Amino acid sequence: MLDFKGRLQLKCQRFMNNNQEHFTNDVLRTDWEYRINLPLWNKEPKRHDLERLIQRFMVHLNRKIYTKKELRRGLQVQCLPVLESEHTNPHFHILLKVPASHRLNSKPDKTYFIKNMVLQLITSLNLVSLHRVDPTHTKTFQVLYDAIGAVGYNLKQGIEQIDFTNVRLANSS
């Protein structure tokens, strides 16, 4: 028979497992459209600094894609950032799903517009020297055809590598 502390620990463990299961289901149900591979050379390998960097990147990306009115309504890019090789070669794999917006509807090619915005942001925020790392931009920005395979690749080092401070799975509008 379990004592009070044992029952409480068991209850907390069940709660965490249930939340993790719901999170995994939400991630797998999302139809991810793009992946950004973002190497962070010459960056301090402190996790909170890297998370703040990704937060700035996502805020700027949302401002480039959505109007102020859409942002006030809660429209934003859905993202799943995962940090890999935190201490040796820090880099993020970010899955994106971009809901329709006024600016996107006025562009003839949504993918080309988003790719240009992402590459401009990487350059303007001095995240990495793109012409050295990926001169053709084929590794930095990728269109996804297999969303579940991309999630599997992103989570290959485990769920603890997810940057939960910057995860956005649904719009709040």
What function would you assign to each model-found segment?
Residues 52-74:
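A short, contiguous, amphipathic alpha-helix enriched in charged residues
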Residues 24, 75-84, 140-142:
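Short amphipathic beta-strand and strand-loop transition segments with alternating hydrophobic
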Residues 1-34, 42-54, 100-173:
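Catalytic "initiation/cleavage/transfer" segments centered on a nucleophilic residue
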Residues 78-102:
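Histidine-centered divalent-metal-coordination microenvironment in nucleic-acid enzymes
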